[in-house]
């Protein structure tokens, strides 16, 4: 299996999505909250159509079984509002060969009706055991999440129900069968269905907000470093470092499933 680095620079057609109150509340409900305020990670919901359209346009959709969400870097310019229509443009901004496979980064830029920036996400995807042809390419300077400078303390736990991935799929309107279909997941080489990386991240952010109550949240960065099987209990560990909060989320064995996490 292979990916041609010539896909760098390819864009999707602009995807228009209406943000509605029901969707906002459903996403919060998937995370165990009753609220009509958009969750900081809600952008993953309205970005999904653009992500899928770009994968289809570039042929990456044919490699979905090899895809692992590996890295996330979200900048929130302003909160989305219920009732508005957002336009999201997806663009492949980098491709590089890594030891486990081909690493592809797409940039998702969402704007309001007046053209104002709402959110920008660099979404890193690892295609396991896939070879990159044409050499590494990059159109943008991309930032890896920095390493943590100090010790992290446990700030909370996240109980993950056996049904968490199914509920998150429907409430977020994000569907990939590795999260809901055991047979598909096993055929993809996984031990079973796994929780979405964005769900793990959203649960972690909710825990951090409840425990440490940051005054602002304009940026989220992390690496996804392990699979979350269900049911399970995750622990979130964090500390304030400068103006940001550093965090790591660990599984029941104490192994990180999110590392180099930052919110600020």
Protein language model annotation of sequence segments:
Residues 179-257:
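Catalytic-pocket segment enriched in acidic/His residues
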Residues 28-30, 80, 101, 119-124, ...:
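Small-side-chain structural scaffolding
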Residues 1-10, 69-157, 230-231, 235-264:
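HotDog/MaoC-like acyl-thioester-processing domains
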Residues 64-78, 217, 225:
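Small beta-barrel nucleic-acid-binding modules, principally OB-folds
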Residues 1-69, 132, 136-140, 145-214:
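Hot-dog-fold acyl-thioester-processing enzymes
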């Amino acid at each position: 299996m292979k990916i041609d680095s010539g896909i760098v620079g390819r864009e999707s057609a602009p995807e228009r999505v209406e943000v509605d109150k029901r969707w906002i509340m459903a996403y919060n409900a998937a995370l165990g909250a009753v609220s009509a305020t958009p969750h900081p990670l809600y952008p993953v919901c309205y970005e999904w159509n653009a992500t899928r359209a770009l994968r289809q346009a570039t042929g990456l959709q044919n490699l979905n079984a090899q895809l692992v969400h590996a890295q996330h870097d979200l900048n929130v310019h302003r909160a989305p509002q219920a009732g508005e229509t957002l336009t999201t443009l997806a663009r492949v901004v980098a491709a590089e060969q890594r030891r486990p496979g081909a690493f592809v980064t797409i940039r998702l830029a969402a704007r309001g009706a007046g053209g104002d920036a709402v959110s920008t996400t660099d979404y890193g995807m690892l295609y396991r055991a896939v070879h990159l042809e044409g050499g590494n390419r990059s159109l943008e300077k991309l930032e890896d999440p920095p390493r943590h400078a100090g010790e992290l303390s446990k700030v909370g736990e996240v109980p993950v129900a056996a049904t968490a991935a199914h509920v998150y799929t429907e409430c977020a309107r994000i569907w990939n069968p590795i999260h809901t279909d055991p047979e598909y997941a096993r055929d993809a080489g996984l031990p079973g269905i796994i929780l979405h990386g964005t769900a793990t991240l959203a649960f972690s952010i909710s825990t951090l907000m409840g425990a440490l109550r940051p005054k602002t949240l304009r940026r989220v960065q992390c690496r996804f470093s392990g699979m979350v099987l269900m049911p399970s209990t995750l622990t979130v560990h964090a500390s304030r470092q400068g103006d940001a909060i550093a965090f790591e989320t660990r599984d029941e064995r104490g192994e990180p499933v999110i590392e180099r996490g930052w919110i600020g």
